[in-house]
Amino acid sequence: MKKKMNKVLVVCTAAAAMTAFSGTAFGATLDLESKTAVADAKDGAGDIQEAINQISGNGNKDGWTIKIKSGTYDRFTIPADFKNITVEGEKNSVIQVMNASVADNLSDAGGINAFGSNITLKGLTIDAGNVPAEEGKFTAAVSNHNGAVGGTGFSLHVENCTIKGTDSQFADGILFDSPGFDVKNCKISGFKQAVEFFGDNFVVPESGNMVSGNTVRDCSFA
C-alpha cells in the first residue's frame, strides 16, 4: 500500500518550465510546504540565483530558507521585495563572488547583493579571490547598497561567515546601506575595509544593530 505524500516538491531548472539545460543542469529543489530551497552543486542543482528566481516565480517571497550544500557557487542577488530570507551554507560551501575577467561588466558592487527586509547570510565562505586593482570594478564581497534609492527598509544580518579577499585596497568585505544590520562571529580578511556603513536617505537607529565577535585581519580598516 502506497503512503500518501504530504510534501510538495518542485525540481526547477528554468523560470517556469520543467526542462533541463544542455550540459550541466542548473536549478534548485523547492519544498513549497516548508518554504525551503536547496542548491546542491554535486547533483547539478547548484545555482543559488536560480533558487531565488524560482522563489520569485512562486509569488510568495516571504519566509524562505535557502540551504546551500557543500560545493562551489557563483554570486547572487536577493531582490528588494524579498522578506525574512535566510541563506545558510553547509560546511565547505563556497561562494565565489568575483571573477576579474568580467569586472568591466559589473553594474553593482560585484559580490553578493542582499537587498530586502531581514535578510540573513549564515555559515557561508565568501571568496572574493584576486580583486582587480582598478577602482570602480568591484567594491564589496557582500552588499545591500542600492544606489541613489538607498536602503530604506532593508536589513541585513551576516553570521558565522568567512569573507576573504586577496589584499585588496579597493574593496570592502561587507558594505551596509541600510538602517538595520548585524555582523556576528565572522572572519573577514584581505580587504581595504572589513565593514563599511553607507547612508542614503535614512537614519540609522542608535540601538538594535550589532557588530560583535568578529575576527578581522589583513585589512587597512576594520
Question: What kind of region is each of these model predictions?
Answer:
Residues 49, 53-58, 74-88, 95-154, ...:
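Extracellular beta-strand-rich solenoid/capping regions of secreted or surface-exposed proteins
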Residues 21-31:
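Sec-dependent signal peptide cleavage junction
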Residues 12-20:
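Bacterial N-terminal signal peptides
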Residues 120-221:
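Right-handed parallel beta-helix
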Residues 1-12:
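Bacterial Sec-dependent N-terminal signal peptides
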Residues 29-67:
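Acidic Gly/Asp/Thr-rich repetitive segments characteristic of extracellular carbohydrate-active
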